């Protein structure tokens, strides 16, 4: 069980933003990788961009760094538009998973490399010394003009300055005595520290870290997580960290930005993301969750698994479909009869995980299988009672209740959806008129009216499974087609992410409506 970072939260609305992303998008070919993202990053925060592989988080980081140019939108660093400014002119540095150290240079040489090329403004002490000498010979008018020129003059670092800065960087990453070492003689963790020192030695405003611990073993990753938190606290600069590892995000971050399919799903503190996920994707991706479908019966009352439960959620419409999240550690198991029991179930597995037992409990004759974390060692096949307190039932509005897909009428009663044509039941627009060729429409297809097949040729449309969510009596599967159309399917069968599938749709299950009618409604 992962414990979120619960350190003092940063009040994001009251602090100065250092980076502002405005309506940022990136399209490669026909694929939208980052889709209209807007985000403010507060100065001094440790921000983690978290999401599954291919969600767009690394592309977003590369655009902030300047290695990718946005298709649209803007990037602002300390209020300045840097969207088209090259990486070397942005005051940010990047640490990659592949360390990219120079094998022909020792540790000191690797860290010093950038310093040797960088020009700096004259230090204040140098300016004052030059002006003091000048005052002994020249008028104040000459001194003032000279000072103006000196304050814009640049020079390279001296060898003494480079040595001092490299030593400071080595000390920061815990490698004080390693300057003379060949980089090939270092362990993976030590090489990563050198890469971090090289990025920090130039004193960037922002440090970008692209899955920097991915190549390390578990023990080394844990150590480096603690080291990065220490460095961040000591330096006080902004860290933007990319990972797909939710444990890293929960334990290291001030703020987590959850990304999926190129869009931000939620922004918040680790505690808020864990306790109050914005949608089913976030709940499923962050930690372990029991996710069910339910109906709101009214304020503080929800129905799922055929029973009514008290909750602490208000403001939903009566009979509104909702997603329900219950964390495994928030369910109490009663091995003896109890008046507090709300559901009865059968233990079908029990695994000891060091500090707790993870128990799978089947309820309602297999309608749903709860994952429960408990300190009780419960026998297999035992019949137990489950208690769920109102404050532990988290209610979320469903992301969608039906597929709504942009489509176009091609001729007569034929409609083009995801690049394929379907002959649908004759339908009229809001004025009672028949649809004509070229009319823009929205196609509505229920989740449970679509069938998936593992033979793409058996389907009408082909696509890739990008997300699978267990919801008890069914799995909810997301499939993106090759022309970037999303279908959500409720199915009895579990599908793996990255499965290539065929999608079967019966024309009789398609309802169409003019898009302008929807806009008016």
Residue ranges of predicted features:
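Glycine/charge-rich catalytic "coupling/switch" loops of P-loop NTPases
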Residues: 2, 6, 303-350, 375-406, ...
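Short coil-to-beta microelement around the adenine-binding A-loop and adjacent beta1/P-loop entry
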Residues: 31-32, 177
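ABC ATPase nucleotide-binding domains
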Residues: 46, 106-126, 137-143, 149-281
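The feature captures the beta-strand-to-loop junction immediately N-terminal to the Walker
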Residues: 50-52
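Helix-to-loop junction immediately C-terminal to a conserved catalytic motif
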Residues: 65
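Conserved ABC transporter NBD signature motif
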Residues: 73-81, 128
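Internal alpha/beta loop-helix hairpins
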Residues: 233, 238, 243-307, 329, ...
């Amino acid at each position: 069980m992962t414990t979120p970072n619960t350190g003092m939260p940063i009040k994001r609305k009251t602090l100065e933003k250092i980076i502002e992303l405005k309506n940022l998008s990136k399209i490669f070919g026909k694929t939208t990788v980052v889709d209209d993202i807007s985000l403010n990053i507060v100065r001094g925060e440790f921000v983690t961009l978290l999401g599954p592989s291919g969600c767009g988080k690394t592309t977003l980081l590369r655009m902030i760094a300047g290695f990718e140019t946005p298709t649209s939108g803007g990037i602002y660093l300390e209020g300045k538009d840097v969207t088209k400014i090259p990486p070397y002119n942005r005051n940010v540095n990047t640490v990659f998973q592949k360390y990219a150290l120079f094998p022909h240079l020792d540790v000191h040489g690797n860290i010093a490399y950038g310093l040797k090329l960088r020009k700096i403004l004259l230090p204040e002490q140098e300016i004052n010394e030059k002006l003091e000498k000048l005052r002994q010979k020249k008028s104040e008018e000459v001194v003032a003009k000279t000072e103006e020129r000196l304050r814009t003059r640049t020079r390279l670092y001296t060898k003494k300055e480079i040595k001092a800065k490299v030593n400071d960087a080595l000390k920061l990453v815990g490698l004080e005595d390693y300057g003379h070492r060949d980089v090939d003689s270092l362990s993976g963790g030590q090489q990563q520290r050198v890469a971090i020192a090289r990025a920090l030695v130039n004193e960037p405003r922002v440090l970008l870290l692209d899955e920097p611990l991915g190549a390390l073993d578990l023990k080394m990753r844990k150590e480096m997580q603690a080291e990065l938190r220490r460095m961040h606290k000591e330096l006080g600069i902004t860290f933007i960290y990319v990972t797909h590892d939710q444990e890293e995000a929960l334990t290291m971050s001030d703020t987590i930005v959850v990304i999926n399919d190129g869009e931000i799903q939620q922004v918040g503190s680790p505690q808020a993301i864990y306790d109050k996920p914005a949608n089913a994707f976030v709940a499923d991706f962050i930690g372990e969750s029991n996710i069910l479908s339910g109906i709101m019966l009214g304020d503080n009352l929800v129905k799922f698994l055929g029973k009514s439960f008290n909750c602490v959620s208000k403001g939903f419409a009566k009979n509104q479909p909702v997603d329900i999240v219950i964390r495994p550690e928030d369910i109490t198991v009663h091995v003896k009869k109890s008046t507090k029991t709300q559901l009865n179930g059968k233990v079908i597995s029990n695994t000891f995980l060091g500090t707790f037992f993870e128990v799978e409990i089947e309820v309602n004759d297999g309608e749903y299988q709860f994952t429960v974390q408990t300190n009780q060692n419960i026998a297999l096949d035992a019949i137990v009672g489950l208690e769920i307190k109102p404050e532990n039932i988290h209610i979320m509005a469903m992301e969608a209740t039906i597929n709504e897909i942009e489509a176009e009428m091609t001729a007569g009663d034929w409609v083009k959806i995801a690049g394929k044509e379907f002959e649908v039941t004759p339908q009229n627009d809001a004025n009672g008129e028949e649809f004509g060729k070229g009319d823009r429409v929205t196609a509505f297809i229920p989740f449970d009216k679509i069938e998936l097949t593992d033979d793409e040729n058996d389907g009408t449309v082909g696509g890739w499974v990008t997300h699978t969510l267990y919801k008890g009596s069914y799995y909810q599967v997301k499939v993106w087609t090759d022309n970037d159309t999303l279908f959500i399917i409720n199915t009895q069968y579990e599908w793996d992410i990255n499965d290539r599938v065929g999608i079967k749709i019966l024309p009789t299950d398609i309802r169409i409506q003019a898009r302008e009618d929807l806009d008016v409604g």
